[in-house]
Amino acid sequence: MAITAGTNLNSVAAPQKQTLSSNYVDFTSSSTEGWAQQYLPELMEKEAEVFGPRTISGFLNQVGAEEAMTSDRVIWSEQSRLHISLRGTIDLDGNVSSSGAKGKFTVTTDIDGNDADDGFTLASHGVRNHDICLLSTPGYVSRVMVVAVDGTAIGVRAYDEDVLTNHSETAGAATLLVIGSEYKKGDNYDGSATHEANEPKFKTFTNKPIIMKDYYEVSGSDAGRIGWIEVSSEGGASGYLWYLKAEADTRARFTDYLEMAMLESEPGSNSTNVDGELGLSPEGDAGTEGLFYAIENRGNVTTGVTGVNAATDLAEFDAILAEFDKQGAIEENMMFVNRSTSLAIDDMLASMNSHGAGGTSYGVFDNSEDMALNLGFSGFRRGSYDFYKSDFRYLNDKATRGGVNATAGSEALRGVIIPAGSSSVYDQTVGAAVRRPFLHVRYRASQTDDRRMKTWVTGSVGAATSALDVMQIHMLSERCLVTQGANNFMLMK
């Protein structure tokens, strides 16, 4: 019988059912120290766990929650900004609707750069007559009053004309911020278009679950075979039955897949070929929005804090804080980073620590220098923010994202910053405002079927369900990730 040569490390499942030399112990090989001889060797039955804890699941359990859903799609909405702030251009000689304005501000986007997205439209910018605004261009800030509004054109007059004339029309985009209003005595709203009420805007997002499956099979004969190696698994299975290890590894790998898919997935585009493979219609309905995709498209991305030196890393970290200030300013945040980024942050913090020579800190054994030296930091405060740092095994392990990062270059992921706590959103499925963690998993469930993590056994081994002389273990899950308030997240690349 021909035996296909396998790898030295039997750590990856074979892509197809085949006999590999790495599945067996060769009793005649010199590496087995002469098992063909008549003397009994000293047998170490316990399988060595050379890769430590191999599973990476648990990240979403730390930072999120799980909740059932009954639909093919989950829809949620998020608050828009409270205050009216716009980007645009300024024409110092412009007039609007013959109002006698001494300047015209033309709206191009809202303060976040949206021109027709996230509930904002140029025609509904919200600026009204008699609003007092701050008008800024590079080097100058003026206080102006709105005297006319015609679509995206806003006519203004300055409280100090001398300052207004200093603005440069070619200096780039201008910013207009409403700070209040002023009316004369006895003045009243007249219900015209220039005095209509402002309705709050909201942003609506959606995601859909994906169906994930895996499978393990062992024949009735092999299920009863006793091996000489004592095996154990992350799931707690142990003994001398090899199929117990194989089944437990399949289950542990599938559990990791449930989390890895929620981190890495992306929704299909209208031109994707995956739709045809899955038989989906309309096009673009394949895939689901994972965490990293959501942050890249709706959140923040930084390339800073790379360990160049402590001073540079600190300046780059402060830039992250400045970006958080522009967003929700969530006080407590959790950092999940790879090893190099974790060490860079430790070095950055150690450089600012005045305790101990060279900025070292004796953080264990009652801070005794003679007992232990702690050069790592798990939590720190900078500005008004608290950060809790943790190593992210998924980004370090060579068999997961760590191996991908080694060849990904500038697209390598070094970590993610996630806000702690919960957010208030309107759930259109529930029909009410609810508070949920910023991250939570939605899984399909009903009174008939719970598809959070569904397993069942078929065959004639054990509980007989068919005439097949096998034990077939099936695993299935249908789930998606809801990333609320992605503007408060930061991806480190």
Give residue ranges: language-model regions.
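Flexible, glycine/threonine- and acidic-rich loop/arm segments that mediate assembly and lattice contacts
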Residues: 1-371, 391-399, 418-493
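Short, flexible coil/turn micro-motifs enriched in small/turn-prone residues
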Residues: 371-374, 410
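Catalytic core segments in nucleotide and nucleic-acid processing enzymes
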Residues: 381-399, 404
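Short, surface-exposed amphipathic charged segments that create phosphate/polyanion-binding patches used
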Residues: 410-411, 415-416
